[in-house]
């Protein structure tokens, strides 16, 4: 709204000035002018007392234009009057005021004002504001209205706050009026003006006088500095922190070009840089330059890279190192740069200025305050490497593209990441090596990878990419990102190939394969019980000791554990055959003491004609165990023919192992989940003895059937076993095994194995239904 009001006010003030200039020749009495003007100003002051300072110029502009009309010549207020118009009005009022005052011929200061750069800068700045989106940070942070009005308000505030010194300004103005008034003009005009000012509204008039005097004392220092500050975008430094983005960009190249002796090829570039005189114009051009010159710069750079690569190849094929030109080049390079980067310009002399040589050698930012980029935040700067490339190629069109040390000092992340001050000459030397490799093959001592694995003959695992491709393309330049890219790719290839070769050369670590345990079979554990049984449970475990011709085996049933344990005397003839599926209840489960059943103890003396032996036969697949009591004579317990499955000391069966401790298998008890027991009619050895078996009628722990063991020599001691008598009964959940207390006295074997068992029914978990039906045999 304020800007709109200002524009409408400008139009109205220009119209008023036209009207007053037209009406002024009709007035003849100069003495009446102050009074009439005073009345006009009082009227305007009364109308616009509540308005902004811009609206107070309604009475100001026609007044002073009329005062500048007398014949005696221009009054000293003429120039200041127009300055006030220029100060309080925008650009639209200035041409109108100049055209309005031109016919009178009295506006002396108008020509000087029209040529002042301050107004143009201010005007260009206001026209320059809509182009701000070229600078993203500034465009986002500062709205357009804020830019166009804030500084102007500050200007008006600084200028109009001088009304405190009203009397001093009036006195100085009157003194200057007396000194500067021509001879034809009486000095009474100054006094009349003072009296008019006293008679008028002192606030508005003294404000006008103070403004005019302020501008007259410091003519354009404040305004030019202010306009230059605004137009050159230095004000952005205080507002957004992005200062000196474009303003100094037009001046820095000219300063650099003045430092050293300029070559004729550099002079037109310097003139081009100096052409934008006004900071606003220069800033506008700098804003437009990225969009206009981006594609053309890249195309020129690409062509120059190709030309320089071809030129460098031709130079490398010739004896350029032995030529006097090459020696002079080396000497001058040592003198100018003072660095170790000798192969920067192998085909031509260094640039004629120390500035160019210092820039080309890639010295850090702190060492070159003049060549420092003006863009601190990654914005486009005036002398980007693209423009520098144009200058160098214009100086020597066939030179290698070694003048591109880095993109800029303001955002080269790869350069900052991989930059190492100790390896400054790596970039240009890498270019020469690439070109020389494309011509004469790879160098012998050149490491092809940054991280090469020493694995014998395959040291250089990752060969460098084709140098012919590199030398002909964009990667031929000294762009640091190219080196980083090559290093990264080469390193990845080297690491990958190194790992592959290492894995190929190193035999695979043979993981310790678990011993080929037999397939899951009934448990047969091979060690002595570590501790005696629980004293609360009277079971001591049925221990049967038999001394055969070759071996002595002892089988123990620790009641506190779920697995049977066996100990072999001379050989480890028993192997643990256990199918462990994570459930410890696969074995015989001992109930509590209250549920135990006490069985009668039968003692057989040595003189009796019968003895009792418990023989367990394991089938070929070791899934059926038959426990039978065999009765034999005192002199002959049994023969190897009676044993159906005695085939050796340790015979591996289908899924387990069968035990044959000598001629007779005694006391081998297997921890199984299901047992199949043959009844009397199905017993394969019925002729030698009667095996009496019972199946419990009820599944309670206290209900078991038992048969008293006869004392006849041909009768066997009964062993009550609760098991599934047929495969159809394998689905039973609770099976009980009753082991009587046995005292075995084999007459043929020396030691007497005493077995006392306070037997308790032991619960057996059923076998899975898919297992093969068990087989058992009773041997006498």
Swiss-Prot record:
InterPro entries reported in the protein's UniProt record: AMER
GO molecular function: lipid binding
Pfam families to which the protein is assigned, alphabetical: AMER (PF09422)
Keyword Membrane: yes
Residue spans of biased composition, Basic and acidic residues class: 20-32
GO biological process, one term: Wnt signaling pathway
Chief localisation class: membrane
Gene Ontology cellular component list: plasma membrane
Subcellular location: Cell membrane
Membrane topology: Peripheral membrane protein
Compositional bias of kind Polar residues: 354-376, 602-617, 753-763
Entry keyword set: Cell membrane, Lipid-binding, Membrane, Wnt signaling pathway
Region (Disordered): 20-59, 341-407, 547-569, 582-617, 635-659, 706-729, 749-780
Function text: Regulator of the canonical Wnt signaling pathway. Acts by specifically binding phosphatidylinositol 4,5-bisphosphate (PtdIns(4,5)P2), translocating to the cell membrane.
Family from the record: Belongs to the Amer family.
Name of the featured protein: APC membrane recruitment protein 3
Organism this protein belongs to: Mus musculus (Mouse)
